[in-house]
């Protein structure tokens, strides 16, 4: 049953960066899609040997020579995947063209060179976001995370090179404990809500709903929260949904080997809190790249801070008095939502 509730959708989008419930949509005639995890198909992981086996098997089953590429960042997750690819496989690295943005290309080149891969840089400009955002909104029927613009551009460039399949390493953070800031403590219920919401809806929306009901199923005694279960059900699905949208839109087959895995035992939170996030992945990286130091973790670079520095929404739905205290990534959510609402009003969705 499709329910129309613009206020619900706006509130959930600014808080969680997506709307998990497929049956609640912004407007009549629009229907969005959310990633569905198939738990019964996941491989159990006990050690790095198991991780290697799954990576090798999934890539072997997926790989078509001259038609398969990898999105390679400067981080360890995609670097590990790169080490199992045949020589001369195409690998793409994003580079945002703006002042002060982290450049991962030199680190990614070390991985590509180590395994004789064909390394290509994809430059990202604000003009790409202006150009691609409308067509992504038309496809998704809902506003989205900014990573989708980069993924869609990568797909378009890959297709020009004859690539039909792309491998990514998104899921390692979620399966193996890479979100170390969210795993840094046993959160109090209210503190976790404040920490997790991308934007508290009441801060930026004139009309909004309280989104705390999303957290209530995870509330524990003594005002604690099962943050691990929440992250698995909400954060993981949000990220996997972004990748699904982008690749399906561009009709590209994609593989995330890590998303096919689950740990056979609980994460060792003490190791993570002592400075070893993704301890199994770090161990495997050191095995595959014995001559390289483990790099610091950084998110996929996006120059939203620079590109949206002076952005102020014009629509009546938004409280503009708070816009300047938002980060660039937070402003992206408002920019994308405003673009979506404008397109709807013009009949362009």
Predicted regions and their residues:
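ATP-dependent adenylation/pyrophosphate-handling site
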Residues: 66-115, 120
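A conserved beta-strand->alpha-helix junction
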Residues: 105-139, 170, 214
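A mobile, often basic/glycine-rich helix-loop segment
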Residues: 177-204
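Acidic, carboxylate-rich catalytic segments that either coordinate divalent cations
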Residues: 2-11, 161-162, 321-349
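Mid-to-C-terminal catalytic subdomains of enzymes
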Residues: 166, 171-187, 229-324
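Phosphate/ATP-binding catalytic cores across multiple sugar-kinase/actin-like superfamilies
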Residues: 48-70, 157-163, 238-241, 338-339, ...
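RNA-binding accessory domains that recognize and position tRNA/RNA substrates
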Residues: 1-67, 345-349
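Hydrophobic transmembrane helix bundles of membrane-integrated enzymes that assemble
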Residues: 1, 7-9, 26-41, 54, ...
């Amino acid at each position: 049953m499709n329910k129309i509730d613009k206020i619900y959708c706006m509130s959930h989008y600014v808080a969680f960066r997506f709307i998990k419930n497929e049956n609640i949509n912004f407007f009549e005639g629009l229907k969005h899609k959310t990633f569905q995890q198939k738990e019964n198909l996941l491989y159990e992981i006990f050690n790095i040997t198991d991780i290697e086996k799954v990576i090798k098997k999934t890539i072997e089953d997926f790989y078509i020579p001259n038609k398969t590429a990898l999105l390679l960042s400067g981080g360890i997750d995609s670097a590990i995947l790169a080490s199992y690819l045949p020589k001369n496989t195409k690998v793409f690295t994003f580079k945002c063209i703006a002042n002060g943005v982290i450049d991962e290309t030199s680190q990614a080149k070390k991985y590509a060179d180590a395994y004789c891969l064909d390394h290509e840089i994809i430059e990202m400009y604000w003009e790409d976001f202006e150009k691609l955002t409308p067509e992504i909104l038309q496809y998704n029927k809902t506003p989205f995370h900014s990573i989708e613009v980069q993924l869609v551009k990568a797909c378009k460039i890959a297709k020009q090179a004859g690539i039909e399949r792309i491998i990514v390493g998104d899921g390692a953070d979620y399966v193996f404990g890479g979100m170390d800031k969210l795993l840094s403590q046993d959160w109090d219920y209210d503190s976790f809500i404040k920490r997790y919401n991308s934007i508290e809806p009441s801060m930026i929306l004139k009309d909004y709903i309280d989104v705390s009901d999303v957290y209530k199923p995870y509330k524990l005694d003594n005002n604690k929260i099962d943050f691990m279960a929440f992250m698995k059900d909400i954060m993981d699905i949000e990220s996997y949904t972004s990748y699904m949208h982008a690749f399906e839109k561009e009709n590209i087959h994609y593989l995330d080997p890590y998303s096919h895995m689950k740990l056979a035992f609980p994460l060792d939170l003490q190791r993570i809190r002592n400075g070893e996030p993704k301890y199994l992945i770090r161990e495997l990286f050191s095995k595959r790249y014995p001559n390289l130091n483990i790099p610091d973790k950084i998110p996929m670079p996006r120059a939203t801070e620079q590109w949206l520095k002076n952005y102020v929404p014009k629509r009546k739905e938004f409280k503009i008095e708070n816009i300047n205290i938002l980060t660039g990534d937070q402003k992206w959510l408002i920019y994308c939502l405003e673009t979506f609402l404008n397109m709807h009003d013009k009949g362009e969705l």
